[in-house]
Amino acid sequence: MTKEDKEKKEKIEYRPLPAIAVGDLVKVGLLILEGDKERVQTYEGTVISKHRAGLNSTITVRKTFQGVGIERVFCLYSPRMVFVEFIRHSKARRAKLYYLRNRVGKQSRLEERFDLVTNTILLDLLASESDPSNSRT
């Protein structure tokens, strides 16, 4: 293994990412430089494609703003990427959802997917909140 390969492997291990699948609704935070100020710009949309290539892995996120479809490609291991969080899982029968480009309005919606893992995590959270011994006083 070369020195470059070792550095790439360390960078990948350094940034753990959530399990993002095609069809998920995600929120991505990007660091934007405006003059000498920095701010985090959020972008929320549906993942329509995922390209896995180690450090060069990317996701393509699509959203509709004022009736116009906007797609943006994000490099997952970019130093400007602040966070990636998923909001909702959706069912996808394809690896690439490019057919959503031709759909408008309600036609572009995807059916929500309910995972047992997500449901058990939510149930554990609800149980801990309803437990009187864990309440704040």
Curated annotation (Swiss-Prot):
PROSITE patterns: RIBOSOMAL_L19. One of its GO terms (molecular function) is structural constituent of ribosome. The keyword Transcription does not apply. Its main location: plastid. One of its GO terms (biological process) is translation. Keywords: Chloroplast, Plastid, Ribonucleoprotein, Ribosomal protein. GO terms for cellular component: chloroplast; ribonucleoprotein complex; ribosome. HAMAP family: Ribosomal_bL19. Belongs to the bacterial ribosomal protein bL19 family. This is Large ribosomal subunit protein bL19c. It comes from Nephroselmis olivacea. The lineage of its organism: Eukaryota, Viridiplantae, Chlorophyta, Nephroselmidophyceae, Nephroselmidales. The gene is rpl19.
